[in-house]
UniProtKB/Swiss-Prot annotation:
Enzyme Commission code: 6.1.1.15
Top-rank EC class of the record's enzyme: ligase
Annotated signal peptide: none
Nucleotide-binding found in the keyword field: yes
Xref: SUPFAM superfamilies: Class II aaRS ABD-related, Class II aaRS and biotin synthetases, YbaK/ProRS associated domain
Organismal lineage: Bacteria, Pseudomonadati, Thermodesulfobacteriota, Desulfovibrionia, Desulfovibrionales
Gene designation: proS
Bilayer-spanning residue ranges: none
Name by which UniProt lists this protein: Proline--tRNA ligase
């Protein structure tokens, strides 16, 4: 393809609303354009990258035995009402009514639709297992869409759904999809890690997230340096260590005027934060609950929500805090907490040690509080966020906390949807059984952005070869030089015959402009044809990833290019 015929509107500056590097570079490279908040148009170059990701995903899904379908984006409310998600999914589900006053939504996911499809077709165990997938546009009405393609409202996703006779069959389907995901992200040239994860609103008993490793990632991972354990910090277990502090003395009230936070109380009383207990108040499915963690710890709200089995968990408002405790925010504590009947504490707090807690009284705390003696704790559980100082819960080794971007998620759904929607079949004995489900998602458009978050430099995008819109940027420095133009056309034909996508820059622009644009769009292989080089019988080749330049002979170019390209691919681990 000739650049002069392409629509590639590159920009020198990023838009003011672009926060992360992928958003900035996708816009600057002319790959996406914003239509409205969280909704983007894929330009020709961006669509090429998107389609390349989708092609690899499709190949590996087919290889794993899944079959492609295409389901409607518009979904009727009655299916969501069957599973109860119409009420509980929240405002991210965009709902509307048609002219006949029937309720619908734009699908953020398709568990209900696929279950309805399969329950209407499958009658016998002989028809199972089934694994169906689609690559489709989804819509989630994010409250704060941001970061371009990273957290948009409209996005392209691959979602697959497996249906099996029993749990062992579901386990096999899960393994097959897990292996397919490993192949997909390896083929895309991404540095990634599969981690244990919380299943969230999708539900199910077990799941893994596939994370692209990037310093700009929104997620934090807990990764053991000594064994294979890896988990999202939301899921990561913390091994409780017994408290060795002295037993509590007599409880005593202490004034703490104006000290609302752990830091302020710690400074005012001259004690370390690990001698204090945070009392955090929530509303869980309409019911007030309290959660306690040590003052220097962070509560893991996902663990609390799972412990409660709650569909919703929201931090209490200042008005609710005052109504339940009789004190403003910052002075809540577990002793005499009459407005909250359910109180849970992290395992680290179990025992007779004396703690400093809020007194449920303005400007006042309590010293020497024993949770065993002085508070009514319903249960002790692992409620805190893991830190780098905690040991691995599997082997006791050291834990690192790298950042990651979620690009895939695989779930063992079990009977969550099939039971509520009565998706059944007859087994060998003619007995009705409920299908066991799994679901498997990949954010196709998010992969493009995540790839750029992981692979960029000060000059632009550094695409891995499998994702690059054009693998080869062939820069013809002087289009008016007939000899150079002829040689460029010859090289272009050879490369295309070899199966490479080539963008021949034949524009009437200064060489500096061509070099900058080639770096910006991220083609992994750059070839430069200049009059001086051709006079010496060479073509300059640049490895976009390393920046290393070399000269390839015009005579024998084919073999020289193949060898050079093999070296570039090796650097990518491909």
């Amino acid at each position: 393809m000739r650049w002069s015929r392409c629509y590639i509107p590159t920009l020198k500056e990023a838009p003011s609303d672009a926060e992360v590097v992928s958003h900035k570079l996708l816009v600057r490279a002319g790959m996406i354009r914003k239509l409205t908040s969280g909704i983007y148009t894929f330009m020709p170059m961006g669509l090429r990258a998107l389609n390349k990701v989708a092609a690899i995903v499709r190949e590996e899904m087919n290889r794993a035995g899944a079959q492609e379908v295409l389901m409607p984006m518009v979904q009727p409310a009655d299916l969501w009402q069957e599973t109860g998600r119409w009420e509980f999914y929240g405002k991210e589900l965009l709902r509307f009514r048609d002219r006949n006053d029937r309720d619908y939504c734009l699908g953020p996911t398709h568990e209900e639709v696929i279950t309805d499809l399969v329950r209407g077709e499958v009658r016998s165990y002989r028809q199972l297992p089934i694994n169906l997938y689609q690559i489709q546009t989804k819509f989630r009405d994010e409250i704060r869409p941001r970061f371009g393609l990273m957290r948009g409202r409209e996005f392209v996703m691959k979602d697959a759904y497996s249906f099996d006779r029993d749990q062992s069959g579901c386990d096999e389907s899960y393994k097959a999809m897990y292996a397919a995901y490993q192949r997909i992200f390896s083929r895309l040239g991404l540095r990634f890690r599969a981690v244990e994860a919380d299943s969230g609103s999708i539900g199910g008993s077990f799941s893994h997230e596939f994370m692209v490793l990037a310093d700009t990632g929104e997620d934090t991972l807990a990764v053991c340096t000594a064994c294979e354990y890896a988990a999202n910090v939301e899921r990561a277990e913390v091994t409780g260590t017994p408290c060795t502090r002295p037993a509590a003395a007599a409880l005593a009230e202490v004034p703490t005027p104006g000290a609302h936070t752990i830091e302020e109380v710690s400074a005012f009383l001259g004690v370390p934060a690990d001698m204090l207990v945070k009392t955090l108040l929530f509303v869980a499915d309409g019911e007030p609950v309290a959660a306690l963690v040590r003052g220097d710890r962070e509560l893991n709200e996902v663990k609390l929500k799972n412990l409660l089995g709650a569909d919703s968990l929201e931090l209490a408002t200042p008005e609710q805090v005052e109504a339940w405790t009789g004190a403003p925010v910052g002075f809540a504590g577990p002793v005499g907490l009459h407005g909250v009947k359910r109180v849970f504490a992290d395992t680290e707090l179990k025992g007779d040690a004396g703690w400093i807690v809020g007194a449920n009284k303005a400007d006042t705390h309590l010293r020497e509080v024993s949770l065993t003696r002085d508070a009514a704790i319903e249960a002790y559980a692992d409620l805190r966020m893991i830190t780098a100082s905690d040991p691995c819960p599997r082997c006791g080794g050291a834990v690192e906390l790298p950042k990651g971007i979620e690009v895939g998620h695989v779930f063992k759904l079990g009977l969550k949807y099939s039971k509520s929607m009565n998706a059944t079949f007859l087994d060998e004995n003619g007995k009705e059984q409920v299908m066991v489900m799994g679901c498997y998602g990949i954010g196709v458009s998010r992969v493009v952005a995540s790839c750029i978050e992981q692979n960029n430099d000060g000059d632009g995008i550094v695409f891995p070869p499998p994702i690059a819109p054009y693998e080869v940027a062939l820069l013809l420095l002087d289009p008016k030089n007939e000899e150079a133009a002829a040689k460029a056309a010859e090289i272009e034909s050879f490369l295309e015959a070899e199966g490479h996508d080539v963008l021949l820059d034949d524009r009437d622009e200064r060489p500096g402009v061509k070099f900058k644009d080639a770096d910006l769009i991220g083609s992994p292989y750059q070839l430069v044809l200049g009059g001086k080089g051709l006079a010496r019988g060479v073509v300059e080749a640049k490895n976009r990833r390393s920046g290393e330049k070399t000269e390839l002979p015009v005579e024998g170019f084919a073999e020289a290019f193949r060898d050079w390209r093999a070296g570039v691919l090796k650097g990518w681990g491909l």
